Amino acid sequence: MAKEPSPAKSRLLDDLRQVMRTRHYSYRTEESYVAWARRFILFHDKRHPKNMGAGEINTFLSHLAVEGGVSAATQNQALAALLFLFREVLRVEVPWMDGVVRAKKSQRLPEVMTKREVKAVLDQMPEGKRLMAGLLYGSGLRLTECLNLRVKDVDFERGEILVRNGKGGKDRVTVLPKSLAPKLKAHLRKHKAWFAKVSEEGRGRCSMPDALERKYPAAPFEWKWQFIFPAPRPSQDPRSMQIKRHHLNETVLQRAVKEAVRAAGITKSVSCHTFRHSFATHLLEDGYDIRTVQELLGHSDVSTTMIYTHVLNRGGRGVRSPADTL
């Protein structure tokens, strides 16, 4: 069993956490980067990173791929964590980074459901989970974006959802499906009554970004800041160690989608993210231009959105097979 890094290395990991919090990185990214830094240090017999370079990083990344069997995406995540450690925490110039071999991701087409399949999956889901999955599909949301929605982020009058701090720290506006608006309003009415009750019991405080909570100390207790899909019970915030109410855990919807896909008899590899892929593809099939879809998805580069043009419903790219002419 691997031993933990020495106190000096632990201080380095604490420094890494502090720098990431100063830069407003998400807690998930913080945990990931700290875990990769710890693994890197332990892999090299607890040597200090400032005494290592491209050779040690390449050896570590190769170990992950060959013995760990990780994907190219995971390798690149580890590399990003180590780059941050060297550049931002140790303040080490890294001209030798050109010598680090970056894993090349395989180009895979996204899995997409047909509209009939989307409906079949949604029909198998219980009401609350169906609403969340409906927003993943109807608004093109990532799972974390859906769970992070707060009451104030929905504009029923304009039919819009404001996605705050999406991937890459960007905000964007996407569509609120008209078909889901009444269901979402009903959900919020029920949620508001529940919030009033738990507030009277002193359990109405929601988790907030640290900077916002310092600026608006009353905000965690206000209705407009509450998560639309809150966790059933408050829990200890891993950063402040205070008891707050967070959003619903990701695994709740992931399990519900998995069960619904099985019940619907769909054999495709479907996850929560498949709804977002299907949203983009169906918009393109319905004639919306690529730039509009790019903005709704929040892609910084249109080339990322272009991948969906390869999975449009054209029946083998619209080609007539020679076998059909025999």
What is the role of each PLM region?
Residues 1-326:
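Conserved catalytic core of the tyrosine transesterase superfamily
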